[in-house]
């Protein structure tokens, strides 16, 4: 017993860092155990703080994330939320706990490389599991194309969240200029193609749009920030073009883009008529436009927000008034995190949320941090199409990686 305690004391930082590395891979594969994994990290952090192995060093982004949780907590009291709203607060707890943990995290280059590797490994395992599930589905139902797409393919995480995980892996692999994360070049190419081409199976509109934006923006930033990397830019464009060409070879995806553009055009011409004339069953893009319209009205009616846990009631009321009782029964969220936060916490909450994004974009630009910039851009794009911090998958992924990457500084930042 004494030997074990002595060993833990002498090797605390090794145990601590390896626990974070294990967390970054295990929560992806076993999301139901993410709470237990976080509790273990909390216990380690408390132990390290007591023994003065760790020091509390939050930055503006981490404090703002914790403040966002505080705003959600406060809204329960200011808007007289029901006790059932506590379950929504439980989902938001990661907004407090993860930034708090990372505020103690002694970010070092070596350990961060291992975190990146662990995330990539987790994504590869998820891809393997997804193909296994799809294969079993095709054996049972014989519908091979349907079985290998969207929710049939991604059964552990929602396809949009899985898409975000994979794009982050693609970015990490391709922007590893020093070749330290994945030293083997052929393996880097395989990992890049694997994490990129699976986007076809996921069918996430936000994911496709993000890939296009990254193709347009990142090579320019590489030229501005680093210079002299023509081969990197060329290979990046070629590989991504191959990936996008493969993605758009699907008639289903091209039809999805076409329908989305058509719906947006009709909606802009006359929003009220568009909503009234929708017939069931609704397509996904139709549903989004209706939900955005309704939730925006709630934001304007309640500039201070309706509070955490109360939005479903207000959404249902507005949808029923528009003749969409069937949609109201589904209790969908707004499918837009910016609108969701404004509806729940008011415009003050939106400003707090935007402050996190703006701060991270500023430090990414000033410190020439391409991976952080790409992750923030990913967060913005996905938040435009999904309420990304409503589920644990989105909260943990973005909170963890935005928090970790925000802890870099010019002295110990990873050379990317």
Functional labels for PLM-detected ranges:
Residues 1-87, 107-113, 117, 176-186, ...:
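Transmembrane signal-anchor hairpin modules in multi-pass inner-membrane enzymes, especially those
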Residues 23-24, 113-144, 154-226, 236, ...:
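Alpha-helical transmembrane segments of multi-pass inner-membrane proteins
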Residues 29-38, 87-91, 153-167, 206, ...:
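Membrane-interface micro-motifs in multi-pass membrane enzymes
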Residues 40-42, 95-103, 161-175, 399-405:
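Hydrophobic cores of alpha-helical transmembrane segments in multi-pass inner/ER membrane proteins
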Residues 41-45, 171, 211, 215-216, ...:
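Transmembrane alpha-helices of multi-pass inner-membrane enzymes
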Residues 50, 220, 229, 321, ...:
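Hydrophobic transmembrane alpha-helices and their immediate junctions
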Residues 222-279, 291-300:
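A membrane-periplasm/extracellular boundary helix in multi-pass inner-membrane enzymes
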Residues 278-345:
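Long extracytoplasmic/lumenal interhelical loops at the membrane interface
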